[in-house]
Amino acid sequence: MNRREFLAGSISSLAALASDGPALAAQKVHTVTGPVLPSEFGMTLIHEHILVDFAGADQIRPGRYDPEEVIRLALPRLEQVKKLGCRTFVDCTPAYLGRDVRLLARLAQASGLRMVTNTGYYGGGQDAKFVPEEARGLPSEKLAARWIAEYEKGIDGSGIRPGFIKTAVGNTPLSPLDARLVRAAALTHKATGLIIASHTPTGRAALEQLEILRSEAVPAGAFIWVHAQNEPDSTVRHRAAELGAWVEIDGMRENNWERRVGQVEDMAARGLLGRVLVSADAGWYHVGEPGGGDFLPYDLVFTKFLPEIRKLLGEKAVRQLIVENPARALGGWRLEAGDRRR
């Protein structure tokens, strides 16, 4: 089957997922300092990182970094974006890649930003480096049970609850483990209402994940295609958005932010701006590197990207991208009206 046939078949089978589902209701979102209504989010960076440890799930252990050093480096950057108008910061570092919810809570309190953390495991290929060895053979149901427990009881005894599910896949066809992780994310979504944000290298991988969600009766609106800007075929982004998935344009740097503007402008031209999320995917403290390595600031979205969007598409588009869409994506859009599991 060639690429065009694959995409056409996937789109046909996913057509029923074109909306977020019937009678959806917004619920509070868990931040590291407590639940917040989506209407209170304000300007939101939906995909950033404070700290990442690439050692691997079987090598991560306490004491690999000094939290005080991380705070010293991260806090000024958080204060900078708050001055630029940011009010909510979504940290996408998952378990076994350096997730530290107590550190996030300290930074949230010190900066005055609302910060959101996650549950889930990060797949992404055959080596499964960031999934604990003992979990690599587990069925989706047992993986989901772990993530649901974090939602219900809090993470690592902290009482801090996740506001979304983070996972990752490699190229297609998805590995058996990646497929189980996506299915586990679907099961967790059905139990908690948390949206799924998946590090996804290609449009083909995005559509394969949406097919797994469809098989579990999970709507496309419960899925964020992270790093969608890396797909060279813009029509795949269009199709994913038409199905109702969230298409995230991130990875903004000094040498590429104008291309990101063009990708967003392309989505807007097709009436799809309502399914677009944007963020810098910046930071972070690199565990194991001297001084934490090259910690990129988070401000580029506010200082360069959004001003250009304002010039090209207007203030309404800016508000949609940085306030309304993140609130809708994270805001607990439920399949059953009146569901109060949040």
Where are each of the predicted segments found?
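Short acidic/histidine-rich active-site segments
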Residues: 197, 250-251, 272-295
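Twin-arginine (Tat) signal peptide motif
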Residues: 1-5
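Mid-to-C-terminal alpha-helical segments outside catalytic/metal-binding sites
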Residues: 7-18, 27-34, 299-342
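Divalent metal-coordination and catalytic microenvironments
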Residues: 47, 89, 189, 247, ...
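Active-site gating/metal-coordination segments in enzymes
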Residues: 106-109, 114-195, 246, 251-255
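Histidine/acidic-residue-rich catalytic or RNA/ligand-binding cores of hydrolases
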Residues: 54-57, 101, 127-128, 206-212, ...
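Alpha-helical scaffold segments that flank or form the walls of functional sites
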Residues: 42-46, 56-114, 141-160
